[in-house]
């Protein structure tokens, strides 16, 4: 699925013009972005702040796919991130997101950011359903 990230002028759209998304299996979704030079830092790799933004924004479409609920709306309660390797600006960046637990109001998520076989970061997050 090709997902346009919000209306023109919003942070989400400015940061990531589009994301690709698909289900890998019943509990796991893959969200892909294509980094550009504007996502880089002074060292010529993907900026850590951009990685954090992608983790946060990529969880939303992943949760919609995994739950099958296109009307799902969540807010981030908590995120824990471990930076493992630098991200290459020339390669697509995938967020592989797994729903580990769902309750009436909460979604418990684990994920990995990857470029091919390289792990860029790992994360866990708690999302609160607001509708």
Predicted regions and their residues:
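Terminal targeting signals and extreme-terminal segments of soluble enzymes
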Residues: 1-131
């Amino acid at each position: 699925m090709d997902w346009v990230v919000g209306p023109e002028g919003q942070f989400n759209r400015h940061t990531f013009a589009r994301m690709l998304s698909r289900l890998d299996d019943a509990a796991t979704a893959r969200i892909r972005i294509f980094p550009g030079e504007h996502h880089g830092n002074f060292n010529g790799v993907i900026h850590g702040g951009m990685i954090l933004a992608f983790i946060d924004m990529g969880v939303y479409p992943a949760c919609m796919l995994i739950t099958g609920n296109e009307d799902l709306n969540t807010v981030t309660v908590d995120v824990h991130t471990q930076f493992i390797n630098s991200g290459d600006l020339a390669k697509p960046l995938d967020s592989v997101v797994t729903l580990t637990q769902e309750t009436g109001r909460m979604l418990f998520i684990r994920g990995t950011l990857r470029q091919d076989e390289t792990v860029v970061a790992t994360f866990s997050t708690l999302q609160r359903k607001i509708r």
